[in-house]
Amino acid sequence: MEQYRGTTILSIRRGNQVVIGGDGQVSLGNTIMKGNARKVRRLYKNQVIAGFAGGTADAFTLFERFEAKLESHGGQLVRAAVELAKDWRTDRALRRLEALLAVADKEASLIITGNGDVIQPEDDLIAIGSGGAFAQSAARALLDNTELSAREIVQKGLTIAGDICIYTNHNQTIEELEY
């Protein structure tokens, strides 16, 4: 059975802000099933922000598991991410889940993959999903050549991705943390 998929998630850390934003489109094959999905949310007492790309049902399962890991590890983002990645890699049921998570708190920005990888990207710039390469290119140019805030860069990067990627729309959800 074909999965619901396609999205763009972009995260930027600049100054005393970290921002994660995502579009709202859910596609099944070449059909838009929903245009206002919420793929970015706050977790663990509003201290962590997270976004997902990939299968929608899979991502919600992973959000629940990740939040449980955050609870059991006192909100320690890196430790919770590593523990989730271990489970994701070794648990038979979880291993079939197809999604990527972008997570951030006041100290770190991470990508968690189903291969068991926990990646802290260069420059604290994360771009995942079908429009990720477009959003990343736009964000990198804006980071290097402007003084825009993290939120403004996320908004512009997602807009550019939505202009180019057929699986990304302009209905944006953006969450930010200040520290």
UniProtKB/Swiss-Prot annotation:
GO terms for cellular component: HslUV protease complex; proteasome core complex. It catalyses: ATP-dependent cleavage of peptide bonds with broad specificity. GO terms for biological process: proteolysis involved in protein catabolic process. GO terms for molecular function: metal ion binding; threonine-type endopeptidase activity. Signal peptide: none annotated. It is an enzyme of class 3 (hydrolase). The keyword Kinase does not apply. Na(+) binds at G162, C165, T168. It is found in: Cytoplasm. Keywords: Allosteric enzyme, Cytoplasm, Hydrolase, Metal-binding, Protease, Sodium, Threonine protease. InterPro entries: ATP-dep_Prtase_HsIV_su, Ntn_hydrolases_N, Proteasome_sua/b, Proteasome_suB-type. Allosterically activated by HslU binding. CDD domains: protease_HslV. PROSITE patterns: PROTEASOME_BETA_2. Its EC number is 3.4.25.2. A double ring-shaped homohexamer of HslV is capped on each side by a ring-shaped HslU homohexamer. The assembly of the HslU/HslV complex is dependent on binding of ATP. Protease subunit of a proteasome-like degradation complex believed to be a general protein degrading machinery. This is ATP-dependent protease subunit HslV. It comes from Teredinibacter turnerae (strain ATCC 39867 / T7901).
